[in-house]
């Protein structure tokens, strides 16, 4: 099963880029991973920004992918529950999981309706930059849980 992690906007901070590189490398030991960036929209009303950013994200998601949005209002899963979800997808021959992290104003309703699942990493708010690293770490953690490896205590 292939994984795709998509987000809006360039990664600004060097330490975030290092974290992305570290965890993307770890994830790739378990599954093919593609990372994609959609250009962020500037200088428009929030609704217009959401719509344009989601149009760009949508072009990066193959129709055969199972789309999972990261949103603070999504389902909260424990790490073992997240691992079980990934494992079920893999075991039922889902060809690809595509995770999308929205821009500053979130997702347009139309893109949200396309999603197969919406999850939250926490009830707390994170920067969109930070979520990139946290999501990749949780995907890596999920694979170590699936493999019964000692990373997750």
Swiss-Prot record:
It comes from Geobacter sulfurreducens (strain ATCC 51573 / DSM 12127 / PCA). Specifically methylates the pseudouridine at position 1915 (m3Psi1915) in 23S rRNA. Its EC number is 2.1.1.177. This is Ribosomal RNA large subunit methyltransferase H. GO terms for cellular component: cytoplasm. S-adenosyl-L-methionine binds at residues 70, 102, 121-126. Keywords: Cytoplasm, Methyltransferase, rRNA processing, S-adenosyl-L-methionine, Transferase. It comes from the Bacteria. It catalyses: pseudouridine(1915) in 23S rRNA + S-adenosyl-L-methionine = N(3)-methylpseudouridine(1915) in 23S rRNA + S-adenosyl-L-homocysteine + H(+). Pfam families: SPOUT_MTase (PF02590). The keyword Methyltransferase applies. Belongs to the RNA methyltransferase RlmH family. Its main location: cytoplasm. GO terms for molecular function: rRNA (pseudouridine-N3-)-methyltransferase activity. Homodimer. The gene is rlmH. PANTHER family: METHYLTRANSFERASE, RIBOSOMAL RNA LARGE SUBUNIT METHYLTRANSFERASE H. It is found in: Cytoplasm. InterPro entries: Alpha/beta_knot_MTases, RlmH-like, tRNA_m1G_MTases_N.
